Curated annotation (Swiss-Prot):
Positions that bind alpha-L-arabinofuranose: E69, N114, N214, Y286, E340, Q409
Origin: domain of life: Bacteria
Temperature dependence: Optimum temperature is 45 degrees Celsius. The enzymatic activity decreases significantly at temperatures below 35 degrees Celsius and above 60 degrees Celsius, although considerable levels of activity are still detected at 20 and 70 degrees Celsius.
Gene: abfB
InterPro entries: Alpha-L-AF_C, Glyco_hydro_b, Glycoside_hydrolase_SF
One GO cellular component term: cytoplasm
Site (Important for substrate recognition) location in chain: W344, Q409
This protein's name: Intracellular exo-alpha-(1->5)-L-arabinofuranosidase
Protein source organism: Bifidobacterium longum
Extent of Polar residues compositional bias: 1-12
GO biological process, one term: arabinan catabolic process
Entry keyword Cell wall biogenesis/degradation: no
GO molecular function, one term: alpha-L-arabinofuranosidase activity
Length: 566
């Protein structure tokens, strides 16, 4: 996660950062020349799967991951609050756990993030009363270490999630990573494994996916490195970890964002050097409406098209990974772990940092090292939810290369779940598109043929208004259509033809299930603690025709999901 020390936040949609030519449109999408000012009830867009449609790939369960960092109130006051009325014997908030399960999260990256780069994992084990307090240099806070890997493992068992564990490559490195691996996954009989048993966890945690550092290209990162420095370091750590335990899946740090001056060359340098020992490379991208304070129309339209940037990001990193494979005469593809993505209004964080600096210059000081302060607690709009739904569509359409993803973060900190101190937990607008995909996108993903009117953006040129993805589980005969209208002004009516799905005997054999629409006439409307259901998906007006096709109208700035079965 990028801090104010970078030129921009970890997102890449600012028009000044674009190349002179428009970004390519999403794969499988063609732009029609239909006017966007026509009659919204007359179909002007179509989604179709032809009989010869081939799947992108199997939908990987890890695509629906999230992220818990020791940052703000994500851990303390989020997943862990011993004094809360719903807290269990471990101090975990049951109301938050219930929402995490409802969200459908499969895998959680922990404990950072920038935090991990000066974190000693040993500080978080053993009796809580013996754990030291430390200064967290990333977020300028005091870390109490009440939560550590043992506690988070217990939480993940209750949440039903896999753990993706990150190791410190900022102030530490090879030995600390090997010690933590032994502690976490070792069978009893060695020093660190026996310490785990003594701390109450008898069986190995069996954590398979490990991130070797976080955003090590960023000058804000404690111990940041050049591409060559990190390439050598990650190669040594990954090699040693795989000697210690076969079957691990190791993630190298990719660029912190597409705005970084070494974007692309960083990935090629790192992956070429450490190709044999790596399985994934990370991708990080955040987006926000840069004109949100004035509600500028052009900025909103650019924001709605953010998935164009994510598509280009995936293509660039995939190309670098392929070049590394060719340089090593290899056969395996390095997969992408998009382990930080979502909407983050980083301008608010930058303003907070500027205020603190100004106060310090005047001799005014806020609490220098606070414990779990309110940080990055963005409240999301209906438009934000549509954009996150659009980004999820993009991840699914590229799941042949993006085999893991973590929507950042999980609770309170730029999160779909908010938890009031000593109060209720509630769903943000962004909760709903993620949950629908996480719970119902199964089987194989398909990028349908899409014909769509175009919209003009300052950042990306002319792009299709409509984007969509289809998933289909042929064995269970269940499927899901996700679609968005990225047009800020005009509704569009879709004709949907899914007759080309494999295993169907013919047209008219599909039955519609639950169909939902997320849209608000005021795209800036939010949920709050006082009105937690102000923005929720509503039933979508859709019907199957005698020909086996469907028609549905998508208002401007909207997301839909349609469950179906054969």
């Amino acid at each position: 996660m990028t801090t104010h020390n970078s030129q921009y936040s970890a997102e890449t949609t600012h028009p000044d950062k674009q190349e002179s030519s428009p970004a390519p449109t999403a794969a499988g999408t063609t732009a029609s020349n239909v006017s966007t000012t026509g009659n919204a009830t007359t179909p002007d867009a179509s989604i179709a799967l032809n009989a010869d449609a081939t799947p992108v790939a199997d939908v990987p369960p890890r695509l629906f991951g999230s992220f818990v960092e020791h940052l703000g109130r994500c851990v303390y006051g989020g997943i862990y609050e011993p004094s809360h009325p719903t807290a269990d014997e471990n101090g975990f908030r049951q109301d938050v756990l219930d929402l995490v399960k409802e969200l459908g999260v499969t895998c959680v990256r922990y404990p950072g993030g920038n935090f991990v780069s000066n974190y000693n994992w040993e500080d978080g084990i053993g009796p809580r009363e013996n754990r030291p307090m430390r200064r967290d240099l990333a977020w300028h806070c005091t870390e109490t270490n009440e939560m550590g890997i043992d506690d988070f493992y217990r939480w993940s068992q209750k949440a039903g999630t896999e753990i993706m564990l990150a190791v410190n490559m900022g102030t530490r490195g090879l030995k600390a990573a090997l010690d933590e691996l032994e502690y976490v996954n070792g069978a009893p009989g060695t020093a660190w494994a026996d310490q785990r048993v003594a701390n109450g966890i008898e069986e190995p945690m069996d954590i398979k996916m490990w991130c070797i550092g976080n955003e090590m290209d960023g000058p804000w990162q404690v111990g940041h490195m050049s591409p060559e420095e990190y390439a050598g370091a990650v190669d040594k750590v990954a090699h040693a970890m795989k000697l210690a335990e076969s079957g691990l899946e190791l993630v190298a740090c990719g660029s912190s964002g597409a705005y970084m001056p070494t974007f692309g060359t960083w990935e090629k340098t790192v992956l070429t050097k450490a190709y044999e020992n790596l399985d994934f490379v990370s991708c990080h991208a955040y987006y926000f409406d840069r004109g949100h304070k004035t509600r500028a129309a052009a900025s909103m339209q650019d924001f709605l098209a953010s998935s164009e940037d994510m598509t280009k990001f995936i293509a660039t990193v995939s190309d670098a990974a392929d070049q590394a494979r060719e340089a090593n005469n290899g056969t395996k593809d390095i997969a992408l772990s998009f382990d930080e993505w979502g909407v983050w209004y980083s301008d608010k964080w930058n303003e907070q940092e500027d205020q603190w600096k100004a106060e310090a210059a005047q001799g005014l000081h806020h609490e220098p090292w606070p414990k779990s302060p309110h940080l990055l607690e963005d409240i999301y709009t209906a438009a934000d939810a549509v954009v996150e739904g659009s980004l999820m569509i993009t991840l699914l359409k590229h799941c042949d290369r993006v085999r893991s993803a973590s929507r950042a973060q999980l609770v309170n900190v730029i999160a779909p779940i908010m938890a009031e101190e000593h109060g209720p937990a509630w769903r943000q607008t962004t909760f709903y598109p993620f949950a629908e995909a996480a719970l119902h996108a199964r089987g194989q993903a398909y990028a349908p043929a899409i014909s769509s009117p175009t919209i003009h953006t300052e950042a990306y040129g002319d792009v299709p208004a409509i984007d969509a993805v289809v998933t289909w589980d042929e064995q269970a005969r269940t499927g899901l259509l996700l679609a968005v209208n990225r047009d800020a002004n005009t509704p569009h009516t879709l004709t949907i033809d899914l007759s080309g799905l494999p295993g169907l005997p013919g047209l008219g054999t599909l039955a519609l299930g639950k169909a939902q629409l997320l849209h608000e006439d005021d795209p800036y409307r939010t949920n709050t603690a006082e009105a937690p259901e102000a923005v929720t998906p509503q039933p979508l007006d859709i019907a199957m025709n005698a020909t086996g096709t469907c028609t549905a109208t998508l208002p401007a700035i909207s997301w839909i999901s349609v469950e179906f079965h054969g």
